[in-house]
Amino acid sequence: MDKPFKNIDEQLDILRSRNLEIDDEKEAREALTIYGYYEIVNGYKSFILESDDSDNFKTGETFSHLYSLYQLDKDIRNGVLRATLEVELSLRTAIAYTIAEDFGEKQTDYLNPRNYRRGHKRQNSNRYPLYQLLDKLNNIANDDIEPYKHYRENHGNIPPWILLKGTSFGNLVNFYKLLKPKQKDKVISICTGLPEQFITDSIKLMFAQALCMIHSYRNRAAHSGRLFSYRSQKIMEYNEPLHEKIMEITREEYNNGVGQTGLFTLQNILSIFKNQRSGFLFEFSVYYSIGYHCQYYPSDLDLLCEQTMINKNDMLRGIEKYSK
């Protein structure tokens, strides 16, 4: 059954009827006008309702509290977008550098399908992923926008560091998957700073899964989905270099859900990249924003630790670091 339209006055009446105190009506009206009832109320009410099967809010709960949860998550989303953009820029540079060095800067050379793996056909598709990717790259090359038009008409060629500017993060992740082992090692080395001779199968698996998880969080943030409680379906399999050496968690802790997904896991996989700005942008958005929110709603700290999967001691250290 479709829900009928409700104006701002009616929206406020609904919230009052459900036991939510409108403690600052001007703020509430502005928030609902700018961001909408669904984004604020439906997105975050579950944390302050009486119970899972009730639409009534806990006694004493306010719109300001609800709105602060929304603003907190919006700040984290913006931070995740900025952090993952840094990863995208690094990955794009690494792939372009690698294929230019190994295959040359001419389109006819670096777009030669022999240089790549075909990948596996997806369900309901009769084409290999490689040819779908090459179609996208050729479409970019033939686009009538700059800088592609300039390079095509004035140089007769678009080098990879220019062509790849037109790719999305998802395109780049797929491109990486279709590289052959030698080129994958180079990309990992450029992105992480780890010498190629030290790149093991475990590190290759970790890097590939990290890209998929980062892409998942990037998409979630870009589409304004609630993020601090998000659990990506793309999980990190137990991996000694990541879980034991970086995250310092045991196999038992992993089996109990720690280090598989969640913001805590995302923070740690961002730390493997040589581009430290991605980690800084992520950590600042999470710890500063949670610290600011908890100045006004300190009882939410345990909730936010649970939802982000960041343990309380790490959370407090992060808040102290980024709140100075």
Give each language-model segment a name.
Residues 1-324:
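Long, contiguous internal "core" modules enriched in hydrophobic/ aromatic residues
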